[in-house]
Amino acid sequence: MRRQTAEVRTGIVEAAYESFWRLGFRRSSVDSIAARAGLTKRTVYAYFRSKDDLLAAVLQRYEALAAQRLEHIGNRMPDDRIGLIESFFDQLSGWASTTPRWSGSGFTRLVVELADLPGHPARAIARRAKAKTESWLAERLTAARVPNARERSREIMLLTEGAMALTLIHGGRNYIDAAARVAKQLVRQR
């Protein structure tokens, strides 16, 4: 019974993840999530008190996936500062160009969608995930002996977020390439 319960919960979270990613939080209904999971709406509410609770579970799962992705990327990055930046933005470009219906960072999209709810718990999860990414990048920059690595990391995060947003708007990889060029200039500075 316990295993079945965990499988049902995981199925709901996966169905919600797909729906939130494709449609956004507000456009996703619990009815459609239940149907996608092959369950009833009542069953979904037996596992999650509200759509907001389900969103929190989805974001925790997405945060874990993002951490795994960063670990995978980090293992493949060169140690030199220029190679590191090239690899980082190549990974971003690859993600944007090979993911069907790519729509940028789910965390960023969610925060934009919930902009009128500054205290929403989902925004805290998104903030924590972005802070982890920034710290991860700062660690890589420090290892590559980039001066002021924390500051450079923040600047590169700004470039990355802007590149993702503009790539989503315009398509193509031009904005990611431009962000990579600027990031290389930043890490060349002494």
Positions of PLM-derived features:
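N-terminal intrinsically disordered/low-complexity leader segments
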Residues: 1-7
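Helix-turn-helix
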Residues: 11, 15-53, 57
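Short hydrophobic clusters on alpha-helical segments that form packing/core surfaces
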Residues: 12, 16-20, 92, 137, ...
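An amphipathic alpha-helix signature
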Residues: 13, 67, 86, 131-134, ...
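Hydrophobic alpha-helical connector segments
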Residues: 57, 71-102, 153-156
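Short, basic, alpha-helical segments at the C-terminal edge of helix-turn-helix-like DNA-binding modules
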Residues: 60-66
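Amphipathic alpha-helical segments used for helix-helix packing
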Residues: 84, 98-121
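Hydrophobic/aromatic-rich alpha-helical bundle segments in the mid-to-C-terminal region
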Residues: 119-131, 142-190
